[in-house]
From Swiss-Prot:
GO terms for cellular component: cytoplasm. Binds 1 divalent metal cation per subunit. This is 5'-nucleotidase SurE. The keyword Nucleotide-binding applies. The lineage of its organism: Bacteria, Bacillati, Cyanobacteriota, Cyanophyceae, Acaryochloridales. Its EC number is 3.1.3.5. It catalyses: a ribonucleoside 5'-phosphate + H2O = a ribonucleoside + phosphate. It comes from Thermosynechococcus vestitus (strain NIES-2133 / IAM M-273 / BP-1).
C-alpha cells in the first residue's frame, strides 16, 4: 500500500523512523512528510501567515523511503503532502509513533491525532499511533502492530470519515495483554503555571501540572482508552471530525421551543 507518514515529534524522533522503516521493509510504499522540529501539542493549527518550506531528507530513513522535513505544523505536513508533494494519493495516512500516549482529552491538543485527522478530512483513512510512555524508547512493538493493523484494514476497510486512535502499552510484545476497541476516556490536567523571571528581568510562565485520570465503571459501554492502557491493553478508539453532540441537538431543539418568544423572530 501507499502510505503517508507524519508525526508531531519531528523528523529526528525515533518513533517515526522505526515506524517508517518497519513499514517499508514490510513492502509498503512509504513517504514521510513531518515537521523539521518538535511540534507536540500544536493541535490542528495551520500556517497561514508564513511560507511553508519542505526540505528533502536523506540518510535518515530506509533507502526506499522518500522523506521531507516541513517547517509547518503536523496538519500542514499532511495538507502539503496531499496537495503538492505526492504524485499519487496514499491509501492511508499514518501519524506517529508518538512519544507518549494520546488518551482522553489529549486528542484535542495532539498534533499526532490532528495530522491523522487531516487525512480523514481529505477522505483518506488514517491512523494515529502512540507509545504510552515518555521514557521508554522501544517503538518496535508499536510499529509491528501498526503493520498488522494495516493488513487487517486492507482486508476489511474502515467506514468513511473514521480515524483510529491507537495507544500501545510501553511493554515488550509478549507482555501486552491484548487489543480492545475503546471509547474516549477522561484525562484532565491540574494545570500549574510556574512564574519565573528571565535574565533581563522579564516575567514569563512555564506550564506544568499533574495528570488526572478517571475510570468510570459502566458495564453497558465499551471500556475507555485510559482504562485499556492501565490494563496493558492496546487501545483502538474510532474518532471523526464531526464534533456535534448528538443528544444536545435534540435537547436544544426542545429548549429553543421554550425560549423562542424571547428572540422576537
Amino acid at each position: 500500500m501507499r502510505l503517508l507518514i507524519a508525526n508531531d515529534d519531528g523528523v529526528f524522533a525515533p518513533g517515526i523512523r522505526t515506524l517508517a522503516d518497519t513499514l517499508a521493509i514490510a513492502g509498503h510504499e512509504v513517504v514521510v512528510v513531518c515537521p523539521d522540529r518538535e511540534r507536540s501539542a500544536t493541535g490542528h493549527s495551520l500556517t497561514v501567515f508564513d511560507p511553508i518550506r519542505a526540505e528533502v531528507v536523506s540518510d535518515r530513513f530506509h533507502p526506499r523511503i522518500k522523506a521531507w522535513a516541513c517547517s509547518g505544523t503536523p496538519s500542514d505536513c499532511v495538507k502539503l503532502a496531499l496537495g503538492a508533494l505526492l504524485e499519487q494519493p496514499p491509501d492511508f495516512v499514518v501519524s506517529g509513533i508518538n512519544q507518549g500516549s494520546n488518551l482522553g482529552t489529549d486528542i484535542l491538543y495532539s498534533g499526532t491525532v490532528s495530522a491523522a485527522m487531516e487525512g480523514v478530512i481529505e477522505g483518506i483513512p488514517s491512523i494515529a499511533i502512540s507509545l504510552a510512555s515518555f521514557t521508554v524508547h522501544d517503538f518496535q512493538p508499536a510499529a509491528d502492530f501498526t503493520n498488522r493493523l494495516l493488513k487487517a484494514l486492507e482486508n476489511a476497510p474502515l467506514p468513511p470519515k473514521v480515524l483510529l486512535n491507537v495507544n500501545v502499552p510501553a511493554l515488550p510484545a509478549s507482555e501486552i495483554a491484548g487489543v480492545v476497541i475503546t471509547r474516549q476516556g477522561i484525562r484532565r490536567y491540574h494545570d500549574l503555571f510556574q512564574k519565573r523571571v528571565d535574565p533581563r528581568g522579564k516575567t514569563y510562565y512555564w506550564l506544568a501540572g499533574e495528570v488526572v485520570e478517571e475510570y468510570p465503571q459502566d458495564p453497558n459501554q465499551a471500556p475507555t482508552d485510559v482504562e485499556a492502557i492501565a490494563q496493558n491493553l492496546i487501545s483502538i478508539t474510532p474518532l471523526t471530525f464531526d464534533l456535534t453532540y448528538g443528544q444536545g441537538v435534540q435537547d436544544l431543539t426542545e429548549w429553543l421551543r421554550t425560549v423562542q418568544p424571547l428572540f422576537n423572530l
